[in-house]
């Protein structure tokens, strides 16, 4: 037979014994102790006096003195022990209070988290490629286990060595040989589109579906083993890598190369044309240069805060991979940029200057943005717009560091 006792009942019993039973036992012990000690003292004195009959009064006085001294000594010892116990108890309580205060202050302080054995993510290194057979051409070098709350070092994430981190392989047995071949050729990076590439929501957003849309396109890609849909070259003056995108076909293909390897190479076919997604690097400074004349300080009372908020607005347009997806068209591109900047400016209260000027109104700011857009497209700012168009045509990169001030515009064909 199992007997279950409620824990609450046990707690009540312990409380009852602590508050009621133990004090009663203590007082009973104290009464019995005092009574017995008194009787023993009387018996000792009377017995000693009977032994020394001729000096009975003297013996009683000596015995009383001895017993009083022993009793006082005992009481002093008990008082001292009780005092020490009280002091120790107080000391223990005070120590625990200070420990509790230290713990609370440590939890709610602004001390760097590495003091508590947490790890920063400042030096996240790119993960290695998936391998020869499973490598995807648009695979982003991210650490899949990174914590979004960590402070990511984008320079470390996005800047990696093409020679070391990407290897073009037709099959697994040719990895080492192909790697050495790539290092000895003018095109440092060559790779084919794989026959299989994992399909996921992220890939559907980042990758172009033209390569995986039909079985025919996959077969055509596998047959053109000598065609290079992407060729990566390094500019020795700037140290930047440039990816040249080649549209290719399976039959009659023509390839045109420029001297600086920066033009988009196209190959045409009478029956089927295969196009590749292009990614262009657009610098925020070029966009701001086209806006500087319109956003004059005297118009709205805005100082250099305008550039900071424009840059912040553009950065907010970046997705997790650091890219902004828009159509590769001048008008749509500029409209997307300025519309997003406009939304960022109107929703950011920090743009208002505190030097006595008034905040821009929706109508005036929208009008200036429209004016900037129209004048930019009509060629009023020839120098800035030409710089932007040259950047769109020549600086073809497959990734860019968004927080450093450069934005990616990718075309989905």
Swiss-Prot record:
UniProt-annotated location(s): Membrane
Region entry Disordered, spans: 250-277
Keyword set includes Amino-acid biosynthesis: no
Spans traversing the lipid bilayer: 14-34
Low complexity biased stretches: 250-263
Record's GO cellular component terms: membrane
Keywords: Glycoprotein, Membrane, Transmembrane, Transmembrane helix
Bilayer topology: Single-pass membrane protein
Polar residues composition bias: residue spans: 264-277
Superkingdom of origin: Viruses
Protein name as it appears in the record: Uncharacterized protein R474
Gene source species: Acanthamoeba polyphaga mimivirus
């Amino acid at each position: 037979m199992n007997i279950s006792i409620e824990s609450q009942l046990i707690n009540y019993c312990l409380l009852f014994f602590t508050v009621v039973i133990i004090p009663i036992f203590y007082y009973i012990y104290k009464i019995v102790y005092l009574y017995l000690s008194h009787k023993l003292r009387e018996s000792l004195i009377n017995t000693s006096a009977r032994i020394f009959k001729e000096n009975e009064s003297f013996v009683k006085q000596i015995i009383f003195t001895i017993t009083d001294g022993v009793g006082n000594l005992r009481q002093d010892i008990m008082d001292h022990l009780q005092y020490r116990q009280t002091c120790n108890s107080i000391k223990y309580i005070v120590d625990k209070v200070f420990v509790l205060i230290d713990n609370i202050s440590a939890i709610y302080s602004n001390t760097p988290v590495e003091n508590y054995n947490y790890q920063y993510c400042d030096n996240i290194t790119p993960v290695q490629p998936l391998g020869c057979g499973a490598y995807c051409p648009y695979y982003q070098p991210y650490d899949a286990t990174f914590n979004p709350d960590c402070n990511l070092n984008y320079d470390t994430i996005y800047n990696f060595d093409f020679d070391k981190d990407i290897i073009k392989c037709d099959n697994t047995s040719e990895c080492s040989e192909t790697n050495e071949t790539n290092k000895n050729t003018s095109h440092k990076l060559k790779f084919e589109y794989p026959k299989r590439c994992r399909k996921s929501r992220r890939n559907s957003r980042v990758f172009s579906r033209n390569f995986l849309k039909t079985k025919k396109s996959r077969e055509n890609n596998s047959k053109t083993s000598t065609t290079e849909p992407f060729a990566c070259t390094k500019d020795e003056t700037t140290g930047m890598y440039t990816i040249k995108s080649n549209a290719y076909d399976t039959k009659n293909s023509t390839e045109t190369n420029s001297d600086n390897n920066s033009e988009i190479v196209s190959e045409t076919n009478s029956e089927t044309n295969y196009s590749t997604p292009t990614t262009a690097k657009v610098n925020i400074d070029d966009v701001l240069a086209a806006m500087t004349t319109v956003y004059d300080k005297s118009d709205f009372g805005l100082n250099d805060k305008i550039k900071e908020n424009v840059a912040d607005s553009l950065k907010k347009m970046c997705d997790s991979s650091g890219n902004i997806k828009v159509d590769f068209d001048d008008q749509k591109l500029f409209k997307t940029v300025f519309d997003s900047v406009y939304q960022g400016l109107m929703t950011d209260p920090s743009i208002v200057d505190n030097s006595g000027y008034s905040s821009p109104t929706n109508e005036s700011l929208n009008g200036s943005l429209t004016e900037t857009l129209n004048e930019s497209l009509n060629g009023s700012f020839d120098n800035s717009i030409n710089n932007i168009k040259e950047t769109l045509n020549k600086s073809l990169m497959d990734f860019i560091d968004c927080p450093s001030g450069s934005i990616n515009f990718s075309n989905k064909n």
